């Protein structure tokens, strides 16, 4: 599935509140490239942008929890110069530096209204 495929997904659910968790993509802080380049901050933003389009079409959503907030040590992640023993799906790098996706998520939280499920 491509990130833009999420734009057209339709959800039909009963009147129940929904929390969406563990979504997003990996990116190494400071690694830049095209919106389709794996591990680039731009690719992480692109994935989130399309996921937000889908999420905004689900009126019952009451909360969003990204895959992880901050990159963390994960011994099985061994791609040299990209993972170096870290899970890189965070909005913040392991040293606390904000990735581009942090600002996108911050904006999404500010714009999203919360109320009763319809």
In which residue ranges do the predicted regions lie?
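Substrate-binding clefts and catalytic carboxylate motifs of secreted carbohydrate-active enzymes
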Residues: 2-118
